[in-house]
Amino acid sequence: MFARMASLRALVPVRALLWRAPVRSVHRAAVRETRIVPQLPTFYSANPAHEAHMDRLEALLRKHTKQQARRVAVERTASDRPRWLSFDQYALIGGTSRLKPTQYRQLVSVLDRLHAIDPQLSNGEIAATLEAFLRKSRLEEQNVVRQELDHLGRACAVGRRKTSSAKVWLVRGSGEVLVNGRTFADYFSKIKDRDAIMYPLRVLDAAGKYNIFAAVRGGGVTGQAEAIMHAVAKALVVFNPLLKTRLHRAGVLTRDYRHVERKKPGKRKARKMPAWVKR
């Protein structure tokens, strides 16, 4: 058997045994050329997007490390410190669910160090880099269209409570209140409902200085009264935006989302159960 195999080897030329070697080398070279290269150098880290940002910021910090940072003896005020992107805002570009609070604090620390460089020694590269991490809320606030008084000097606002909704027109006057074309006392027989409507005005000591015209629908009497209260508070802010803080602290600018809990099957009410009987 071994003699037969030796005779077969003698019959096969040597070139036939070596022809595959150059093909393998060519194939390996082609694979090496077509290999996919990751876009980020930090591709194999736990959070590639965040590490890429940190590498760029730290490289910029090392580049300007010889420049003297500002040495301020007194504490900076809140207006001096820039408003960086919040954790949720930075997570959109910093790794989404992979971002950890420690990584975010690390980013803010480096941003603060870059911001601490003396403006006279800083350049456009630093400013452009920091601008990408600033909050855009200030620009958004400038684009918000503020409500204004109409040509008759009225402020219009809409308030809601439970299933009730109210549209209120507020104008300076002698304190007259009309609800769906009816007088204040005629529409709301309960004193607590009337007090709820006048509460925003009492917070500002402005009772009797504004006329209120309300169109309300849906829900019960108490829900309608609180919907009007919510609308009156929003209309007062249209008259003077500086009153927003006082009204917000009084709790009349925030809508009350509480609703009656629905009844469940097998229960007498939402949670009340029938008395348990052994037999």
UniProtKB/Swiss-Prot annotation:
Pfam families: Ribosomal_S9
Entry's localization field: Mitochondrion
Domain of life where this protein originates: Eukaryota
GO biological process terms on file: translation
GO cellular component: mitochondrial small ribosomal subunit
Gene name in the database record: MRPS9
GO molecular function, one term: RNA binding
Keywords (A to Z) from UniProt: Mitochondrion, Ribonucleoprotein, Ribosomal protein, Transit peptide
Family: Belongs to the universal ribosomal protein uS9 family.
Classification lineage: Eukaryota, Fungi, Dikarya, Ascomycota, Saccharomycotina
Name listed for the protein in its UniProt record: Small ribosomal subunit protein uS9m
Cleaved signal peptide residues: none
